[in-house]
C-alpha cells in the first residue's frame, strides 16, 4: 500500500481532507459540547473547528473550541511525519475542560510565554494548579478522553497507510500515561526505570524530597503527578546532575506494549 504523506493529505479536496483530519477528534467532544460533526458549528451557530493544513509541509493541526472567541481550545492536536521511523509523529495534543478553572502557568509575571517552564515560570499559579490536582503543563483540568484519542490517532494513522506512531513524553507524567495507552520507548526507558528506583526509600530522588520548595515535599514519591512536579522543579537535575530529557516513545497500530516503569502507581 502506498503511504499518503501529510503534505499530500493537505492537498486533497477539502471535503476528503477534512473527513480524514476529523478522525483525530474524539467523538465524545462533538456529543458533549453539541458540535455538529458535519457543519462544525456549535449550538450558537459558530464555527468552532479549525485547522492549519499547509500543502508544502508534512504537518497538520486541528483544534476545537467551545465558543469561537475562547482563548483555550477544548481539543488541539498537531501531527507530522517522522521520516526516520516512517511513522506518524504526534507533535502535541491538548484536551481541556473549558468549564474548569484556569491556572495561568503558561504566562509569567511579565506576561511572557513560559514555554512549558523552559524559559520562565509562574510559581504561584503552578502551586495553585498542583494543589488543584493538575500536573505540570496543564492550565485546566482534562476531559479523561486520552484512551479514546489514542484510538482516533490509530484510525488517522491507518488512513495514511502507516503502522507506527511516535511522540515525546514531554513531562514525566506524560510518559507514564503514554505507557498506559500502549506506548513503549525508543529512547529513555532506562532513565524512566532509574527514576522509579531513585524515588524509592533510600534513593537519590527520595532523599531530596526535603520540602525545600512546595514541589519537593515529603511523600511526593508516592504519585505520578507529584513525582512529575518534583522533576519539573529541577529535582532530577539536582539529584542526578543531569537534565531531564523527554523520552522518545512509539506505538504500533493495533498493538499495546505492556510497559510499566512505575509499578503499583497512583496517579
Go through each PLM region and give its residues.
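Short His-Asn-centered micro-motif
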Residues: 167-170
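Non-catalytic substrate-recognition and accessory regions of acyl/acetyltransferase enzymes
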Residues: 1-138, 155, 159-160, 164, ...
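Conserved acetyl-CoA pyrophosphate-binding loop and the N-cap/start of the following alpha-helix
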Residues: 141-152
Amino acid at each position: 500500500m502506498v503511504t499518503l504523506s501529510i503534505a499530500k493529505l493537505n492537498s486533497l479536496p477539502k471535503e476528503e481532507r477534512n473527513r480524514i483530519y476529523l478522525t483525530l477528534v474524539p467523538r465524545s467532544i462533538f456529543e458533549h459540547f453539541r458540535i455538529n460533526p458535519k457543519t462544525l458549528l456549535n449550538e450558537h451557530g459558530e464555527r468552532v473547528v479549525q485547522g492549519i493544513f499547509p500543502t508544502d509541509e508534512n504537518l497538520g493541526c486541528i483544534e476545537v473550541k467551545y465558543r469561537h472567541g475562547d482563548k483555550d481550545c477544548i481539543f488541539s492536536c498537531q501531527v507530522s511525519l517522522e521520516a526516520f521511523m516512517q511513522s506518524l509523529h504526534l507533535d502535541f495534543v491538548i484536551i481541556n475542560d473549558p468549564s474548569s478553572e484556569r491556572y495561568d502557568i503558561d504566562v509569567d509575571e511579565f506576561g511572557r510565554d513560559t514555554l512549558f517552564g523552559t524559559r520562565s515560570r509562574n510559581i504561584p499559579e503552578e502551586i495553585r494548579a498542583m494543589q488543584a490536582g493538575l500536573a505540570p503543563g496543564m492550565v485546566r483540568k482534562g476531559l479523561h478522553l486520552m484512551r479514546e484519542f489514542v484510538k482516533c490517532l490509530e484510525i488517522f494513522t491507518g488512513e495514511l497507510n502507516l503502522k507506527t506512531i511516535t511522540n515525546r513524553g514531554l513531562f514525566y507524567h506524560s510518559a507514564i500515561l503514554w505507557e498506559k495507552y500502549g506506548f513503549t520507548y525508543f529512547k529513555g526507558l532506562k532513565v524512566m526505570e532509574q527514576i522509579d528506583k531513585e524515588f524509592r526509600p533510600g534513593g537519590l530522588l527520595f532523599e531530596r524530597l526535603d520540602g525545600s520548595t512546595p514541589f519537593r515535599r515529603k511523600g511526593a514519591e508516592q504519585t505520578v503527578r507529584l513525582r512529575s512536579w518534583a522533576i519539573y522543579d529541577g529535582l532530577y537535575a539536582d539529584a542526578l546532575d543531569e537534565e531531564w530529557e523527554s523520552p522518545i516513545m512509539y506505538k504500533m497500530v493495533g498493538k499495546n506494549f505492556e510497559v510499566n516503569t512505575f509499578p503499583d502507581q497512583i496517579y
